[in-house]
């Protein structure tokens, strides 16, 4: 009988499945984004979503660095189809917008994309029900408008089922908004409202490649 080799398996050296890994990180104070995007973790998808814990610091630098650290820990590679997505709100804050823009421009990993919303992620939900170029003072103003269609909407509430039938409409509306602001720098507070979530969803559905800034 052939002798079987027995050895110690080192951490990080095991072969992972061939499915590409999509790393996603979002601001830690809200579970809204994670709750929504977790519905795209379909076993039949040709990728696997992994959420990265944001920790207490939710500024753009901290989110980006946390995702890059996890990327390196998992030994991910663009050549294998792995992707990273940093989901951010700029809250009509010019300093936040400038920080995200600078970070995106200095990012050397072309597999990592920034998914930005202004004022907040809720713009994406609102676009399921209407196309609008109306400007919003802040995230609360967006939520107030959203409650016309989802009266029970609250932060950290899973509203995927309430929106899923209009996802294609929301993608179309988000692309129309991007075209509306085509002459404006992005991210910037001039683009209000605007969100990249539609492009991310199209990417997750295999319909469109997400762009880079």
Predicted regions and their residues:
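Eukaryotic endosomal/vacuolar membrane-trafficking regulators centered on PX-domain-mediated PI3P pathways
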Residues: 59-67
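C-terminal accessory helical subdomains adjacent to catalytic cores in phosphodiester-
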Residues: 2-22, 31-54, 68-85, 90-213
